[in-house]
């Protein structure tokens, strides 16, 4: 049951209400949201010499932000941030890239491209979040109750459906690593073993 979430709605991050007495003292500390956001530039990412390394570097940078965001003036935000380690990595410049490639916005090729692009963002943020969890021995709060922990989150990816299909989109991603079903299965097993550091990772703000 979702009782609260942030109003910007670029990310669905669950909050919990606090219980406060008449003296304005916490009887039960709730959790609120710190928006630790960043954005990839689609044009630049598609010409990056190493797409995955670029995303992993962004995850490290945003992890520093979330680890450093101690908003003690609002204890519920500090509490929620320390439990979830949340960031939101998104994208800007999609229309610019499609125009550059003479692909009509909303065409089948544009939809296919966007699906693959965000699949790669998802994959590489998961990879690095798992690496950080393994290094630190820390996962986000209640990781063990998540679909990441039991592996079912990865089912749609281990089916091998998320690969470029049209010749045009294959051309756009030429030279960029596209994870196979086996790669997703390997990542699933690593996440089940060592967890994820971040509760949320993606947001288009």
Task: Pin down the residues of each PLM region.
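Function-dense linear segments that define catalytic or interfacial modules
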Residues: 1-81, 91-101
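Flexible, active-site-adjacent loop/turn segments at secondary-structure boundaries
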Residues: 35-40, 85-87, 103, 141, ...
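Short, contiguous, pocket-lining structural segments
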Residues: 54, 86-90, 121
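Active-site lining segments that contact anionic ligands and/or coordinate catalytic metals
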Residues: 32-34, 84, 197-201
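Internal maturation/activation junctions in enzymes
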Residues: 55-78, 104-205
